[in-house]
């Protein structure tokens, strides 16, 4: 009597079905179980609402004990690096978010070299990842590479400042730059559009490489294609941040209250906050891939070239030392040979003198 086949191994599909179609589900389950890692850097002058915006984006307080420096402290203030990591879980999906803040950027009177500290930090994370990747234990590498940089631009100017241009050009080959116009509630809608166009023109004029959202695939649904088009058209994002709940039209919303009305943070008609958050969430994977495939690979290739040249130089130095040692040894041997010849001649001369003296006696 034949045993009944276990039901869990019965193929419910049509004949010829193998099951490869379930691979994406396996990858998804594995990724969800492992969790995601993302590092966001925020750079901009003090007073542009960077901390408020980040807290608004992720509904968390990353800077509970921050002390705001006075004007006198800012004069000689240097750029600092403050990395805050928080574990966020939403519907079973875990995100290890690291926000790298740069207090002191642009505060000092002489801000020419203020971005060197930031560049060093970005390179250090690449260096650490390269070291861990080259080690024996590669299963538990923590990825602290900077995947995205929100660069905050002041709404009070008429475009990019020289410092903005210099900084973005200094890092655009190392990290994905997303330009953000801060405190958009200080501008009218027409002023925002003029400022956006001016900034984009100056970015193109100075050949600054910012992060470009990839085009939607042809097989994507129309809603996603339209969303991608709107996100692209919104760059640079003009945003408002607030952690205060106020009442507007009978409901509680996060926003800012003015004598003339309420600016709602999450109202797309008031600012680009929702678009910025949507861009970050929907393109988080692409930001990581561009970091891995472009910025990190550029760093890695250059680093290995420098390492190769260093090894070559060391080998050349060793060969040079050996040649010098051999030449010195030959000189010593020649000198010893000459000394031996002189001693031989002196000994022969002494024998002749002795024989002469004996003959006279």
Curated annotation (Swiss-Prot):
The record marks 156 as: Important for dimerization. Filament-forming cytoskeletal GTPase. Forms a filamentous structure with SEPTIN12, SEPTIN6, SEPTIN2 and probably SEPTIN4 at the sperm annulus which is required for the structural integrity and motility of the sperm tail during postmeiotic differentiation. Required for normal organization of the actin cytoskeleton. Plays a role in the biogenesis of polarized columnar-shaped epithelium by maintaining polyglutamylated microtubules, thus facilitating efficient vesicle transport, and by impeding MAP4 binding to tubulin. Required for the progression through mitosis. The lineage of its organism: Eukaryota, Metazoa, Chordata, Craniata, Vertebrata. Coordinated expression with SEPTIN2 and SEPTIN7. This is Septin-2. Residues 34-306 form the Septin-type G domain. Keywords: Acetylation, Cell cycle, Cell division, Cell membrane, Cell projection, Cilium, Cytoplasm, Cytoskeleton, Differentiation, Flagellum, GTP-binding, Membrane, Mitosis, Nucleotide-binding, Phosphoprotein, Spermatogenesis. Residues 101-104 are annotated as: G3 motif. One of its GO terms (biological process) is spermatogenesis. Gene3D superfamilies: P-loop containing nucleotide triphosphate hydrolases. The modification Phosphoserine is found at residue 218. CDD domains: CDC_Septin.
